[in-house]
């Protein structure tokens, strides 16, 4: 957001319904609420801005594509970061989530610390985590729906993929290449990054490529 403001763009970050609070609150949400909220917010912005670029990370990328397909008017670009079109959960991801859920303190040097900082839901009990099962099903439904609509994308799309992602399968990259027309797709590999942590060189690459994309839309 800071970089987009520096380039003269107005920017806003959305907090999905029942995110930013407790695990119990998150368990009560659902994908329909998330989609309706994002659609409503983008519709509100369209009243004030002629051109909008959607930027999302992880599930936020899925919602960006689905929002664009719902109402493409005035949306001139999409930036998708670590998009889970397909999932491949590595052991490292399980360890990090267990640490976030059950360790009182996580040092900054621990890879789990990046997950803790990025999480929009507070750590909770194991029973509460189990109650999230319907939300995981919601995520897979969003993944499937996004894969289905990608061939209809007809605006510039910048995709970042962390090559060491512990959650997103490399098959997601192949899906982008197979479905989005080549003239609209720009794909960037972040070779030293994970789903929540970005190496210094990758930060520089992301910063430069994102800036150029905004200015070219």
Predicted feature locations:
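Short alpha-helix in the alpha/beta-hydrolase fold that links the catalytic acid
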Residues: 1, 155, 169-178
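Catalytic histidine-centered segment of alpha/beta-hydrolase-like enzymes
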Residues: 193-206
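Short beta-strand/loop motif that positions the catalytic acidic residue
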Residues: 153, 159-161, 165
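Catalytic histidine neighborhood in serine/cysteine hydrolases
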Residues: 13, 174, 178-196
């Amino acid at each position: 957001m800071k970089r987009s403001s520096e380039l003269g763009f107005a920017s806003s970050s959305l907090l999905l319904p029942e995110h930013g609070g407790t695990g119990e609150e998150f368990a009560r949400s659902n994908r329909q609420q998330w989609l309706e909220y994002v659609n409503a917010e983008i519709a509100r912005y369209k009243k004030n801005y002629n051109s909008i670029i959607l930027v999302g990370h992880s599930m936020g990328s899925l919602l960006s594509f689905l929002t664009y397909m719902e109402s493409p008017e005035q949306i001139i670009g999409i930036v998708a970061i670590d998009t889970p079109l397909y999932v491949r959960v590595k052991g490292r991801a399980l360890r990090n989530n267990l640490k976030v859920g059950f360790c009182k303190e996580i040092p900054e040097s621990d890879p789990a610390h990046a997950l803790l900082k990025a999480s929009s839901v507070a750590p909770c009990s194991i029973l509460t985590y189990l109650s999230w099962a319907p939300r995981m099903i919601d995520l897979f439904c969003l993944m499937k729906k996004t894969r289905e609509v990608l061939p209809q994308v007809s605006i510039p799309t910048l995709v970042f993929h962390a090559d060491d992602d512990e959650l997103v399968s490399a098959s997601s990259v192949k899906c982008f290449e197979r479905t989005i027309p080549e003239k609209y797709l720009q794909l960037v590999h972040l070779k030293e990054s994970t789903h929540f942590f970005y190496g210094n060189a990758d930060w520089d690459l992301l910063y430069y490529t994102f800036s150029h994309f905004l200015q070219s839309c």
